[in-house]
């Protein structure tokens, strides 16, 4: 009788009370109408989940993380100063996301640090190109390769692929940049663990990522007080997001890459946006449900 009661209680509890990352995330990936790659890693415990994580995918503006890192590494190496001034010219203005093109006058003068703020907080394309003019597209790629990320590459200045591409075939295939979900999570891990950056450099980069204004993707379904340090990207058929999410069980690096998406609407409820948001929510809920997750 006692054994029957115990068996009944176990069955009632069910296996879904504390679902695994795979149980939470695999259905989201399966239901998405488009190509998807995922990588998740708890940086304190090592618990992880990967799906198509080594497939090279377009980044859209997510590649601006690599540009930001190169800027701060060159500052760390005394190749430039973050207080160096840049002057906005009419010829510098490109379309797309951001505020410089529409709201700043020709001749506006500001620091490289402020250009970086605009590049990350508002994904400003013009600001990104101003930073790239100083650090160099090829320098970003050399840095990523030296750090062990050969597939994390920027191919050209934003909206200037026809005249500034350093890899025309990659530009045609991937657009602005490319990466893999695994490489992006490992890059975020190296950044968080200060394996490559001095503390001031690391903290400055993370502060930029924490001020990303996008609320359509990772931050969308998370509690307002959750710290999310991330960069997202969007093109007509691509949605991406990658960052560090603070959970009760530690900091978790997450990357979601999607492309060839059926939903190509420029709308906050785009299916790619919602997928990024749901992945972040499932990851947070998983690690909020236990402070001692499994390591594998």
Model-derived features: where do they sit?
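Acidic helix-start/capping segments at beta-turn-to-alpha-helix junctions
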Residues: 43, 81-99, 135-136, 158-162, ...
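Beta-lactamase-like hydrolase cores
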Residues: 13-55
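Structured C-terminal helix/loop/strand segments within mature extracytoplasmic catalytic/sensor domains
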Residues: 17-25, 134, 185-216, 229-296
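Bacterial N-terminal signal peptides
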Residues: 1-10
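Mid-domain, small-residue-enriched loop/turn segments at the edges of structured enzyme/sensor domains
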Residues: 104, 108, 129-188, 192-193
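Active-site SXXK
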Residues: 46, 58-86, 119, 254
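Active-site-proximal loop and beta-strand segments within enzyme catalytic domains
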Residues: 73-117
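Second-shell loop/turn segments in exported
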Residues: 51-58, 99-106, 114-118, 126-132, ...
């Amino acid at each position: 009788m006692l054994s029957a009661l115990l068996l009944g209680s176990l069955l009632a509890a069910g296996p879904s009370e504390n679902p695994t990352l795979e149980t939470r995330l695999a259905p989201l990936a399966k239901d998405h109408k488009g190509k998807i790659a995922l990588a998740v890693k708890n940086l304190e415990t090592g618990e992880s989940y990967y799906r198509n994580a080594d497939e090279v995918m377009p980044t859209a503006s997510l590649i601006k993380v690599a540009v930001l890192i190169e800027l701060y590494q060159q500052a760390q190496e005394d190749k430039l100063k973050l207080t160096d001034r840049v002057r906005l010219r009419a010829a510098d203005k490109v379309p797309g996301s951001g505020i410089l093109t529409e709201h700043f006058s020709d001749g506006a003068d500001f620091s490289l640090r402020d250009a970086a703020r605009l590049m990350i907080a508002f994904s400003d394309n013009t600001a990104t190109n101003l930073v790239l003019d100083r650090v160099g597209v090829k320098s970003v790629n050399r840095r990523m390769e030296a750090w062990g990320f050969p597939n994390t590459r920027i191919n050209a200045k934003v909206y200037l692929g026809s005249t500034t591409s350093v890899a025309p075939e990659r530009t045609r295939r991937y657009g602005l940049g490319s990466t893999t979900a695994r490489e992006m999570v490992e890059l975020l891990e190296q950044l968080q663990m200060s394996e490559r950056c001095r503390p001031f450099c690391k903290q400055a980069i993370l502060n930029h990522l924490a001020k990303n204004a996008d609320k359509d993707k990772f931050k969308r379904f998370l509690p307002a007080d959750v710290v999310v340090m991330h960069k997202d990207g969007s093109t007509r058929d691509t949605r991406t997001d990658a960052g560090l999410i603070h959970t009760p069980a530690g900091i978790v690096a997450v990357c979601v890459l999607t492309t060839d998406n059926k939903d190509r609407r420029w709308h906050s409820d785009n299916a790619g946006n919602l997928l990024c948001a749901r992945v972040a929510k499932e990851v947070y809920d998983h690690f909020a449900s236990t402070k001692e997750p499994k390591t594998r």
